[in-house]
Amino acid sequence: MLKSIHHVAIIVSDYEKSKHFYSVILGLKIVAEHFRKERNSYKLDLAVNEVYQIELFSFPSPPLRLSFPEATGLRHLAFSVENLEEVLKHLKK
């Protein structure tokens, strides 16, 4: 049976901005980065505590997600943290 979540895949609208946010601001480790020429897109694998992964995908002109929370697709991604106040302070810098 299922033991845990292995990874979450997210299609991003701005690859470089998202790469910076997840790797620099959140401090996730870049495991692999690939440019897929045939799709003109990037795939970035990020490690979360060496246990889980977040995959960021970029595509040229991806369709925007509807602005309704009930729309199909990833609704949100939640992280557990040691100290919420410290994390909020860090993110606001």
Q: Where do the model's predicted regions map?
A:
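Short aromatic/hydrophobic contact patches that present stacked aromatics
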Residues: 7-9, 45, 76-78
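Vicinal oxygen chelate
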Residues: 12-16, 69-93
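Conserved short histidine dyad/triad with adjacent acidic residue
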Residues: 60-63
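Core-facing hydrophobic residues within beta-strands of well-ordered domains
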Residues: 2-5, 74
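Short Gly/Pro-enriched turn/cap motifs at secondary-structure boundaries
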Residues: 35, 68-69
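Residue-level detector of transmembrane insertion/anchoring sites
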Residues: 45, 65-66
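Conserved beta-strand in the GNAT
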Residues: 55-57
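Core segments of cupin and vicinal oxygen chelate
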Residues: 2, 11-53
